[in-house]
Amino acid sequence: MNFDTFHNIIAGQHRSARETSSGVNPLDRSSLWPAPVATANDVEEAVRSAQEAFPAWSQKTYKQRTELLEKFADLYLAHANEFCQLIATECGRTAGNAAIEVYFAAQWLRYPSKYEISQEITEDDKKTSIVTQEPLGVVAAICPWNFPLMLALGKIAPALATGNCVILKPSPFTPYSSLKLVELAQQVFPPSVLQVLHGHDDLGPMLVKHSRIQKITFTGSTATGKQILRDAAETMKRVTLETAGNNASIILPDVNIKAVIPQLAGGLWFNAGQVCIATRRMYIHQDIFEEVVAQLAEASKDLTSSIEPIQNEMQLVRLKQALADANAAGYELLSLGKTEAAEGFFIRPTIIKNPPPDAHAVQQENFGPIVSCIKFSSLDEAIFLANNSDTGLAASVWSGDISAAKRVAAKLEAGNVYINGPPQPDPYVPFGGQKQSGLGVEYGLPGLLSFCQTKSTYVYK
């Protein structure tokens, strides 16, 4: 299999198209390979093929399906070097950071095999009740550009394990790794069980509105998530949404500053801040505020001296506008790292120092290497400020007292709270957002069950 020509995969076959589009290398803005743009006819054929494959696939046992996922994991890792090169190119990453995603993502192919989905039986004098979990049918997985492999596999694996057929739609900014992933999968799975369609912005709505697709699983912006909810309501589709998180960290005064600063800095700037659970708002106790900000800036110098680019120009423009607005408002900006490279989608990592808590720069999610550092004087104030957002994907608490940190964590309105460590997903732990950061959960047993529908059978004696 070569890694420099790209096709949609429908019914187990390569599909080209009259129209193609090309991604852009974020490092130098050069055009990448042409990829076929799916049409409405392609969508219809993919859905029809998935429906035809569904009966046989869903009738396999859970163990049979997870064994195939394990086999695919081995095959995928055998091509890890090629996927690392693809991720590095389409995302603008260093080879090392591309490898982090490629190898980390393999966990999602293996995690379903650690679970069993069994029926529940209850009995009384009159009847036996049998509760089973059945697959939904055809699932469309709509994925973003920041971690194209990991987030795709996090949707594909549980959907396939539970007996569904999947149509993957990658971001038009980063189609290449997904197209090759599904092409490779044809060596393991029956035709039409896993397909992939690359296209323009009209492709997602075609899938969401399709009457024969039973579920949408989506990661992306809150605005798009809301539109998916509206469109999916017409056919009452199941939806799982993971959307924006303007995530807060609380740094308590008893923290070991020297010990936590490297973790704070690493969490802020990894992947140029293009991480859905990265901190955007950092609330620091007033007694240690200046020291933490100074040490954070110092520790960030090495990390940001060769920071990677923003993945696409659209996001770069948004971030530059956010910094221009913050500067115009008179906020103190600490620009870190080297001067921005003119040829790529680069922006200097920036700390916005103590802006007003209600400032636009604080209340909006800046999806990139920008963090607002804000003073607080009391624990109640910190909790209020952290919760004063319409999003709630992730939060973190940093303290020398674990019991105190747990009490704070219990009061935070976020789906994922991390204590004394940077945010990182785990395939065995449910992951989802509160408020406008999502709907439903992924990963763990609840994530598997989100791709099922419950059937209760009553057998009277």
From Swiss-Prot:
<protein>
    <recommendedName>
        <fullName>Putative aldehyde dehydrogenase FUS7</fullName>
        <ecNumber>1.2.1.3</ecNumber>
    </recommendedName>
</protein>
<dbReference type="InterPro" id="IPR044086">
    <property type="entry name" value="LUC3-like"/>
</dbReference>
<feature type="active site">
    <location>
        <position position="242"/>
    </location>
</feature>
<dbReference type="Pfam" id="PF00171">
    <property type="entry name" value="Aldedh"/>
</dbReference>
<keyword id="KW-0520">NAD</keyword>
<dbReference type="InterPro" id="IPR016162">
    <property type="entry name" value="Ald_DH_N"/>
</dbReference>
<dbReference type="InterPro" id="IPR015590">
    <property type="entry name" value="Aldehyde_DH_dom"/>
</dbReference>
<dbReference type="GO" id="GO:0004029">
    <property type="term" value="F:aldehyde dehydrogenase (NAD+) activity"/>
</dbReference>
<comment type="function">
    <text>Putative aldehyde dehydrogenase; part of the gene cluster that mediates the biosynthesis of the mycotoxin fusarin C. Within the cluster, FUS1, FUS2, FUS8 and FUS9 are sufficient for fusarin production. The other FUS cluster members are not essential for fusarin C biosynthesis.</text>
</comment>
<dbReference type="InterPro" id="IPR016161">
    <property type="entry name" value="Ald_DH/histidinol_DH"/>
</dbReference>
<keyword id="KW-0560">Oxidoreductase</keyword>
<dbReference type="InterPro" id="IPR016163">
    <property type="entry name" value="Ald_DH_C"/>
</dbReference>
<comment type="similarity">
    <text>Belongs to the aldehyde dehydrogenase family.</text>
</comment>
<feature type="active site">
    <location>
        <position position="276"/>
    </location>
</feature>
<feature type="binding site">
    <location>
        <begin position="220"/>
        <end position="225"/>
    </location>
    <ligand>
        <name>NAD(+)</name>
    </ligand>
</feature>
